[in-house]
């Protein structure tokens, strides 16, 4: 059978009839199902196939049940790979990108994915960029974007800045190159303004998002409560510190303040700039080395240098040495930490390394450090108190004496969004000597196409006619911003744009009626690797756009599915490992439906999927059997009413299996726990087909296929449409009522035992008498009983029959 031709026929039908476009009827119940948009790399991979197959199954089920479904697709089309391709192949990034989009569109269609074609866009489209640039200006004017110079994560390979979230174990998230530090000007989005709301609203996502994702975001936001206080610089050190009077410190363990034996500050701390002038050459070399290390390198081993200056302990008045340490971070708290070696593993390790004294302040002097809370000693008036009690009393004392205050700190840092590359959305700002930084007024700011990409710096810096412009405010000569936006900005609001993608600027980015109807996204599908990148940014951007008045929404995604990776030979598929399976080859050999069926059957969505050629062939055989048995069906014999009493056991079993599959379908697709165990549903469908294959009763076959094809449509749509059209003119593509009578058990299975040892099973009618059951049991166990003397017959209703023999 030519499965590919059949699939192509229905794909053309769906396209011509715009079968997957949502209706403009706000009274209909809606579902917005969305899979994370792909980067147009050229060809789809099995990870794409799995992601979009899961989403498409949900979409098709809801359409069959009369939901107005929005299921769009787009392309996250800006980014470094296009520039790398330009260097490697001598092709313009725009050409490379849009050719890839066209290719991927064809592959998606060949898989039968039911995307709304009329809502498709690429994030590099000028109309999309225009709104994004307007958002940037609005955020700037609201004070949610600022520009400053800072030490930044720099990828030497991609020659661009990376946000903290884009550095994975010290390496670039995209190309895996070791990240270094570089000082540059950068635009920042003030995501920290939303830290508390982002944390608090995680509670609303419980039971709807995977707990692991919620925990990852909670830890990344990293809320901590503690004491912020000051150490005064010792009088004799003020000159070396250029009259800086004090150093501010944050601690979550105020109860350990009497154990402080040193202060650790980040190499970027303003105190270092002045005090460094008096350190010896070896320590100077160490400090400079720390400054140039990556965040990952700073975690590998503790390093530091004594600055030769002291601070005064606010309670004991003792001198405390000030050290530069690589574990002190400039962007956390004040960039200064109090070192308590007796109560902290990191502080203990550093103190031992540099022979710094250790002061024990807990009742148990053995096995330092004591990281757990204990009863204090050597802690002034707070000695003999439990740590938790002492902590509150010490904070209260500091606040009363105006020595410090209770504060909340967050690990989350503002989002740096400047990128030194060509193929990105231009930042719509003008640098004017007279007016400063001025927003562009003519949007969109588009990229020049006559550029040379050679891998040496940002091409926009070298494009004079684009770079040099006029200030929109004073009309004097000015410079255009040559940095482009981080591509994570594009993916932080695209799901909103899908609601009305054709809106022009004068009508705003979104039609609020459509936005109110379709948002939030009901089910969002993508990899867990996006937990603290895209998913956190999208939540932030939604809240920021709300505060700008564009939308009335707090959270963008109601439910989240994080699908597992596709593995082959136990490892993730990748070209470097040579274990890639080509979707094109699979489609050519087996067809789209077999690939879809295998993907859904091989593992539940959240689990890793191990590629298995024999299981794929099994899916192919199932579809073939479905076609083969359909040839025996005469659809004119189908009547929906059956009298159970007139059916034999095999016929009853066939109906039971079919309606069990229908019932299972509703359970899977409407599962409140969002596990979507499609594998169990497909197993139920296979049992139903096995039962139907034993049948010659055309009415049973007709009813069975009428129901089963509807159940299978979300998973193998081409097959379901072909056979449903052939047999029923697709009359079965509607909600079907479960015939509960078919599910009623009229038989029971009993265990048959002799002297308590299980020997067999017996299936009997549920209303069979004890005498009938014993007679049937004896017959079933005849070979065990023929030479035995039965002493006792025991019948436990609905469970077992036991014969006691001599």
UniProtKB/Swiss-Prot annotation:
Keyword annotations: Aminoacyl-tRNA synthetase, ATP-binding, Cytoplasm, Ligase, Nucleotide-binding, Protein biosynthesis
Domain of life: Bacteria
SUPFAM superfamilies assigned: Anticodon-binding domain of a subclass of class I aminoacyl-tRNA synthetases (SSF47323), Nucleotidylyl transferase (SSF52374), ValRS/IleRS/LeuRS editing domain (SSF50677)
EC numbers for this chain: 6.1.1.4
Intervals of motif 'KMSKS' region: 572-576
Keyword hit for Protein biosynthesis: yes
GO MF annotation list: aminoacyl-tRNA deacylase activity; ATP binding; leucine-tRNA ligase activity
Sequence motif: 'HIGH' region, positions: 38-48
HAMAP family per UniProt: Leu_tRNA_synth_B
Family membership: Belongs to the class-I aminoacyl-tRNA synthetase family.
The protein, known as: Leucine--tRNA ligase
Organism: Helicobacter acinonychis (strain Sheeba)
Lineage, opening ranks: Bacteria, Pseudomonadati, Campylobacterota, Epsilonproteobacteria, Campylobacterales
Gene name linked to the record: leuS
